[in-house]
Amino acid sequence: SSLGEQQFEIHVDNDGSSAWSRQMDAVVEAGIITTLSAGNEFGGATFAGCNTIDSPGDAALPITVASLDKDLGLAIYSSRGYTSDLRVKPDVATIGSSIMAPDAATNDGYTSKSGTSMATPLMAGIAALMVQANPDLTPSEFKDIIAAYSIEREIVLLDDPGFNDCSVVETRPDNEFGYGQADPIVFVEVAGSIDRSLNVTMDIDTLQVIQNRSQITGIASGLSSGSEGRVEVRVGGAEWSEAKDESNDGDWTSWSIVLEPHNNSGNTTIFARLYLDDDHISPIDAKRVILIDEVATNQEKGLNEESLLIVLFGALIFLVPV
């Protein structure tokens, strides 16, 4: 979905409450995989380019797509988050600059166009291939695959005054690339390998505070005793790490893992999967959490949510001990 708009606007009402944003959420709730343009409103502003995600790209459930140049750098025009209700958008980034598109006004019927309206059809095409690989793919599975398997992109401040850091405390997703750069081949392979007889769940809550080297526990089902399968956990864009089987029968019904030390504090996402082989992988369990530098003692699960006061101010999130 794209409105074809390209102008600079600062938003205070891009909270997903507009009629068309709510309609896009309803489309996803009906089981239809949906991709939306982030918008082309970042412009060249030094600060105000943040919070320029346009409606309906601010809808919560669809995948909102940012645009990359041909060199895979983030396009200067591509709108950045946050939304005005402080959600992280976009969700993913793919190439949208200098794309050949139909144009009846030209001699050969084509012209070069740039915008998130060019990036979004590419992401929709990737989604179509994923559905071809797995006709039963759900919108939530689609989003979890993008979140877990996108190529990690580091935010880099360039000399260009229009490129600024809109993601003060975000690591994955961030408000410029989302979960990262689309990886079409991996997305399609993973979609085709989903085995719903395999399941995994982490014992953590959304936005739980997680200390350095915290222990994460969880449950899994679908593996027989002594099988070659395993539970794997990934923090942000790091590599998948194998958990420890804590079950009595060697079937991973109970598992744990002590997280590797993290370098970047702030909001990120922890992913878990039950892996049997390349053709049989469980749906992803994904949880947004808050990483802090304090080292966990006795491999505890992390601080209780009430031990920190989360203060929201504009696009900033401050963690204050209480």
Which ranges hold each PLM region?
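Active-site-proximal beta-strand/loop segments in catalytic clefts of secreted hydrolases
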Residues: 1-4, 37-41, 65-70, 77-81, ...
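Substrate-binding/access-modulating region of protease and related hydrolase catalytic domains
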Residues: 1-61, 84-87, 104-120
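Sec-exported extracytoplasmic/periplasmic mature domains
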Residues: 25-32, 39, 67, 128-135, ...
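Subtilisin-like serine protease catalytic core
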Residues: 29-31, 58-61, 82-89, 132-145, ...
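Secreted peptidase-domain scaffold signal
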Residues: 39, 173-175, 180-229
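Hydrolase catalytic cores
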Residues: 94-172
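Long, low-complexity serine/threonine/glycine- and acidic-rich segments characteristic of extracellular
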Residues: 202-302
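Selective detector of the "anchor" transmembrane alpha-helix that sits immediately C-terminal
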Residues: 305-322
